[in-house]
Amino acid sequence: MRHAVRSLVMVPVLAIMICSTGVFAQREPMPAPDPIAKLSDIYCTGYISELPLTPTLKVVGGEMENTKQHFAEGDVVFLNKGREQGVQSGSVYYIIRPLGEVKHPFTKKKLGTFVRELGLLRVIEVQDDTSTAEITLSCDTVEFGDLLKPYEEYLGPESRDARPLPRYSEGTGGTKGQIIMSRNYREYIAANQIVYIDLGTRQGVQPGDYFTIYRKVGKREGVTDIPDFKVNTDRDRGYQSERYRGGDFSIGSTNEAKSDVIKNRPTVPRKVLGELIVLKVDKGASVALITRTTAEVNVGDLIELAN
């Protein structure tokens, strides 16, 4: 009888424990997705600003200026404003340097000013008309006259589960644009590299948007054409085709010229090259990270908003 009572007592206890465990499991927070970009991809890429730059706070000196004129992470620098101008101890600023006007390489439209991001600094002491700051992150060397703008914390968009690339689809019909520049002016671009696109908030683009990178079939591959003086003729080499560029090593003629076939054919699928995600946006241009590729990407390749 005692065993029966003991069993009856234990059943509710076990039920309570199981229910409690279930409640705790339901309340356990899910881990947040990891940011898709490194901090250097967020703070060191630079950007194209359509609006004129107006910062008046700048670097005017350094603790070690008698021995060097370029400053980096850990160096102490002096700013041209202080307590009287509203600068506060502990404030963090981006260090920036405008480099010049950017034009669209294909339409020649003015896109704005390219601004190089040099790093971050924190104000550690404030005087009446000057401030002392320490460079906490350096992407490039900091020099006299470099400008400052207030820091806003941003870790970049979150990653998402990989989806199949639409290798042969007709597209989504979404917003279309073009890659207009690459970081460090690379000609051939691969995954995990930074590019700049000709779409921004004006076109409804937001950080975290994914775009498919593609190229129209028939468009020349690579970034340069072969000059005419390097083109061989059949008279030089004895090949049946009138001219060749060594493309597929074909030496036999066909019944119909390739140009005629292309001219008269229906629209064929585009060549999908990869995918990119938007990291930072301005009014008419954005900074993006190429997440994956199926082939080398070039400046000038087309993009379309993915689903």
Predicted regions and their residues:
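Bacterial N-terminal signal peptides that target proteins for export
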Residues: 1-12
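Surface-exposed, polar/charged interaction patches used for macromolecular assembly or partner binding
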Residues: 2, 22-307
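Bacterial N-terminal signal peptides
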Residues: 10-20
